[in-house]
Amino acid sequence: MKNKIKKRFAFILLSLFIVLTLGSFKTDFFEIAKQIEIYNSLFKEINMNYVDETNPAELMETGVKKMLSELDPYTVYSSEQDVEDAKMRRSGDFVGIGANLRFINEALTVTELYKGCSADNGGIRTGDVIRKINGISVDNSSSGVDVLLGGKKNSVVDITYVRNNVSKTISLSRDGRKEKAVPLFRLLENDIGYIALTRFSRGAAREVESALKFLLIDEAKGLILDLRNNPGGLLQEAVNIVNLFVPKNQLIVSTQSNIKKYNTRFVTKQQPLSLDIPLIVLVNERSASASEIVAGALQDLDRAVVIGKQSFGKGLVQQPKPLPYGAQIKITISRYFTPSGRCIQALDYSRKTKSGSVKSVEDNADVFKTKNGRDVFGGGGIMPDINLGVSSKFDLIKILKKNNFVFNFALAYHERNPVKNLKDFSLKESVFNQFKKDCLSKSFSLETTTENLLLKAYVAAEEENLSSIIESVAVFNDALNKEKEVEFVLLKSEILTLLSEEIIKMAFYNEGVYEYALLNNKAINTAKILLGDLGRYAALLK
């Protein structure tokens, strides 16, 4: 009976996926029905006649993963359990202990603490390894760790953690505090206001509005809105933030799709808080989605000068769709477009090279015009008016973080040399050299198509005992290692900043990172200089 249910579920699920993934053929119902019938028969014949016993659910999961891999990474399937866990996390009754954790070397490690939250007050420290939650052991194979940690506000959770090979169990109250979207705002020298926005969570626009009101009361004559490292969030919050600086009924962003019902326009609905304060928006390669909507709209409307590095380029819109048995698919339904008509999406997942890599949209970037007639370009995210970025072949920064090289090095440094004063803190070149040496001594991938193909060639050559091929691949591998060294030198400043931020966060929380940036940061200093020269500021917007 169970097997029949599994098979029925598998067929229904596959049918729905086929309909969804054949979106460009929605009017060709015969073709859709034909493909569903073929898949149904294929799936049935395999499960009924294959020489070995098959697992319908596993076969279906493999098929689903392969199908979705042909689309984009944002179109994802969620099982019934995944959906229920997500609902629980979004519930107002579900709160945590105020810490970020991730598995490092198969150990659940505390990577960040929120100031004043229960984990922080209870003595947990960055780098501690969590072994048990309410007596349940956790390891790299554990799923739903956040569900174990979370619960109703003020409920108690028992945590067993290890520090310096010493195990300790403590009880923490789930306090429900959430990190602010605006961790810092301040009036700087020369009456320049500064607002850091880390996410577009619910209420983010109210936090920005409140900060702006304080700064205007203090007679701020210019404003820096820092969206660096902001991954995005709720679209309406982005629209409401832009509304603080532009008139009512102004188009901020639109979505366009092959399906008419997904074509929408988002316009401002309120009177602005400040129409004329000189405004600068800071972005970098980790500013994405809603961050790019804010930066792009203010740039298109010539309301702000954008400074920093080219943004991430995430301009795709997703919407969840229910599936049978409580499952769900979050599917890309449309693209974001800024007021000038440009799309900020960097990668075109419908266009792939022969090697299988995704082509960049900016290869065919079109020119668009701002309100004042300035040239701006579509594809590849938001290009700053003042570009402080360095041209790089690889996303080395992302790779260093992904492999936990930055966190592990910063933790070791923090334990040996705890930062006591932000004003006196500065990493020397010797620290960079040691970090580079440590990283290069480890085997890590630049995640290029070339490297992936070389690895496959090396493995195949070993299996077939082709010594000459193995030697040739080794030569290519040496060349790639030299490329890594070149990238380290090229990105030295960015890497030192990244290490500094991680070390400071361990001593002074996320708020300290922004405090330190105000002391000596290239992007902020560039913004302050520009706001001190309003003639040049105005010229950049013409």
Predicted regions and their residues:
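Polar, glycine-rich mid-to-C-terminal structural blocks
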Residues: 290, 302, 309, 313-374, ...
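Conserved functional hotspot residues or short segments at active or partner-binding sites
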Residues: 343-344, 348-349, 354-542
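Cleft-lining beta-strand/loop regions that shape enzyme active-site pockets
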Residues: 23-35, 39, 43-51, 55-56, ...
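Hydrophobic membrane-insertion alpha-helices, especially the h-region
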Residues: 10-24
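Extended, small/polar residue-biased N-terminal targeting/export presequences
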Residues: 50-111, 154-184, 518-525, 536-542
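Short linear motifs in exposed loops
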Residues: 112, 141, 171, 332, ...
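N-terminal secretory signal peptides that target proteins for export/translocation
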Residues: 1-5
